Amino acid sequence: MLKTIALDAMGGDHGPKVIVPAALSILKKHPKVKLTLVGKEDQLALLIPEKNRKSFGQRLEIIHASEEVGMDEPPSQALRTKKNSSMRVAINLVKEGQAHACVSAGNTGALMATARYVLKTLPGIDRPAIIAAFPTKNEREVRVLDLGANVDSTPENLYQFAVMGSILSSAAHNIRNPRIGLLNVGEEEIKGNELVKKANELFETRKTINYIGYVEGNTIFNNIADVVVCDGFVGNAVLKASEGVAQLIKQHAKEAFSEAWWTKLALLPAIPILKRLIRRVDPERYNGATFLGLNGIVVKSHGSANIKAFVCAVEEAIFQVDKNIPQLIKEEVAHILKEFENK
C-alpha cells in the first residue's frame, strides 16, 4: 500500500520552486510513497517535466487550491477566510483519509490553528506541541518539545508533552524507556519557576515515564536525555538559538576555506573532519518539526527551507506514517488514563 503525503505546495518563502523539486526527489528515493501537491495547478504543472509525470504516474498527483496563506497572515484570519487555501486543503486530505500526513513550510501559527481546528487533538491530550530532533555529541538525537505551540502551559500540559515525546523517541530509536528531562535553569530542586517546580513534582509522582530530573540548557546536546520538555516560550528560544549557532559554525567554516591559498593548503588534512562536523550540526538535516498530539500527522518545514531541507521534512512525515505515531500516542494515553482511574 502506498503512503500518501499531502504537500502544501504554495507554503514557505520559496513555494513551488522548492517544493516541487523536493517532491520529485522524494518519489525517486521512496518507491512506496505517493505525493499529492496541493496548490495552484497551472503553476505546479509547469514545474513538473513530462518524463517525471510519466515515470511516477499515479504516485504524483496535483489537487488545485485557489488560495494561499501569507507568511505574515494572522492565524485567525487564515482560518476564517482561507477555506480553499493550499494549507487547508492539504490538512483536509488528512482528515478525510485521502492522505496519511501533511507537510507544510507555511505560516506556523496558521498551520497550527488550522490543523487543530480540522484534525482536533487526540483523546486525553489538551494541547498539541511542536517537537523536533537536535544533534547530540554522539549519533543519537535528542527531541525537544514544546518549540512554540504553547507560550503558556500548565504542569499537566508538560506531562502530556513528556508522554508524547517519549513515544516518538521510542519509535525513532527503538528504545524501551527513553530518558525524559525537564528543562530548567539548574539541576537543584530549589531552582526554577513555579511551572517547572510543579511539573517536576508531577513527573516524579507519576511513574509512567522514565524521568531523570532537570536538564540545563548547556547539557541538552550532551546525550543525557532522549527527550527534553519545556514550555513553548523557552523551547522556541532554544530552537532559534541552536539554529543560529549551527549557521555560525557553517559560516566560519566557509570563511576559513575562502582565505589565501596557503591557508587552504594548511587546512587540507582537516577537510574530512570539518565536513563531518558541518553535516552533524546542519539545520537542514534536522528540518521537520511535528505538531504532536493531533488526530493526524502534520509536519512543519522551516519557511526558508531549500530542496534538501524540505526533503528531510517529508521523510520525517514518512517515518511517522510508518510507525503510526498518532495511534501509538492514543493507545498509551488511554492506558495511562485507565491506570489513574483504577487507583
From Swiss-Prot:
GO MF terms held by the record: phosphate:acyl-[acyl carrier protein] acyltransferase activity
Entry's localization field: Cytoplasm
Pathway the protein contributes to: Lipid metabolism; phospholipid metabolism
EC number: 2.3.1.274
Gene Ontology CC entries for this record: cytoplasm
Family annotation (Pfam families): FA_synthesis (PF02504)
Class of this enzyme: transferase
Main localization category: cytoplasm
Catalyzed reaction equations: a fatty acyl-[ACP] + phosphate = an acyl phosphate + holo-[ACP]
InterPro entries xref list: FA_synthesis, Phospholipid_synth_PlsX-like
An example Gene Ontology biological process: phospholipid biosynthetic process
Top-level taxonomic group: Bacteria
The entry's keywords: Cytoplasm, Lipid biosynthesis, Lipid metabolism, Phospholipid biosynthesis, Phospholipid metabolism, Transferase
Assembly mode: Homodimer. Probably interacts with PlsY.
Function: Catalyzes the reversible formation of acyl-phosphate (acyl-PO(4)) from acyl-[acyl-carrier-protein] (acyl-ACP). This enzyme utilizes acyl-ACP as fatty acyl donor, but not acyl-CoA.
Family: Belongs to the PlsX family.
Name this protein carries in UniProt: Phosphate acyltransferase
